[in-house]
Swiss-Prot record:
Its cofactor is NH4(+); K(+). Belongs to the type III pantothenate kinase family. This is Type III pantothenate kinase. The active site is at 109 (proton acceptor). Pathway: Cofactor biosynthesis; coenzyme A biosynthesis; CoA from (R)-pantothenate: step 1/5. GO terms for cellular component: cytoplasm. Substrate binds at residues 107-110, 184.
Length: 257
């Protein structure tokens, strides 16, 4: 069995693949101070509830955008799973061209998404990943990563309003029925949600104009479901895109071993 650990700035996903399908997934708040031992206690309890155990794994793959956490995640795999993990950005061969000025700066999540999208959809593509930050990445027809755009995430935008403006409350994000709000909460929700839709549509249009080629737009990430039905600019919503990419990277590296 394979344990895939996909760590973003806000949440960390632990997913179990039995060789045929994903059989379990759990999320935890990302905490860079959590030790390998703490991860093991938490994970072993969840595995036990699913009829599994830490010792059942013969592989582990890690994708993290939090460098200070990788040490502890690696030790979790070594100490408790008794396997050497495959770490995106360190010892994992991706098998795709990275056509940007500084390839070492490309985030692990963006590269994993590129692979997950390329094997599922005909390219070229724009992959939108909505999390703490929202990324718009261009994937060539041959699967090459060609760069993209990084913007603040929708939750970060709403939190910035509350933090920087003394009289604005902390507000939950939801899709308003109208653009013009008639109270403070409604106005904030409309501004952030519909403003974000405008950002998505505007950046997609500009990327397509700059590339001058047809591009399929695929959205993933923790808050991508918020945008479903709110814009025609997104062609596909794919919540499993990232772990699909991780599984493909694992298989490619196993084939070379």
């Amino acid at each position: 069995m394979l344990l895939a650990i996909e760590q973003g700035n806000t949440n960390t996903l632990f997913a179990v693949h039995d060789g045929e399908r994903w059989i379990a997934q759990w999320r935890a708040a990302t905490d860079s101070t959590r030790t390998a031992d703490e991860y093991a206690v938490w994970l072993s309890q969840l595995l036990s509830m699913a009829g599994l155990a830490l010792g059942a794994f013969d592989g582990c793959i890690i994708s993290s955008v939090v460098p200070q956490s990788i040490f502890n995640l690696r030790n979790l795999s070594r100490r408790y799973l008794h396997v050497e993990p495959l770490v995106i950005g360190e010892n994992a061969e991706l098998g795709i061209p990275i056509r940007i000025d500084k390839p070492s700066e490309a985030g692990a999540d963006r590269l994993v998404n590129a692979i997950g999208a390329h094997i599922a959809y005909p390219g070229p593509l724009i992959v939108i990943d909505s999390g703490t930050a929202t990324t718009f990445d261009v994937i060539a027809a041959d699967g090459g990563f060609e760069g993209g755009v990084i913007a603040p995430g929708i939750n970060l935008s709403m939190e910035a309003l509350h933090t920087a403006a003394a009289k604005l409350p902390r507000v939950a994000i939801q899709k308003p029925q109208k653009v013009v709000g008639t109270d403070t909460v409604g106005a904030m929700q409309a501004g952030v949600f519909w403003g974000y839709i405008a950002l998505i549509e505007g950046l997609i249009a500009r990327i397509k104009a700059e590339r001058d080629e047809p591009l399929t737009v695929v959205a993933t990430g923790g808050v991508a479901s918020l945008f479903h039905g709110a814009t025609a600019a997104i062609d596909k919503f794919d919540p499993d895109l990232t772990i699909r990419g991780m599984l493909e990277i694992w298989r490619r590296n196993q084939a070379k071993a």
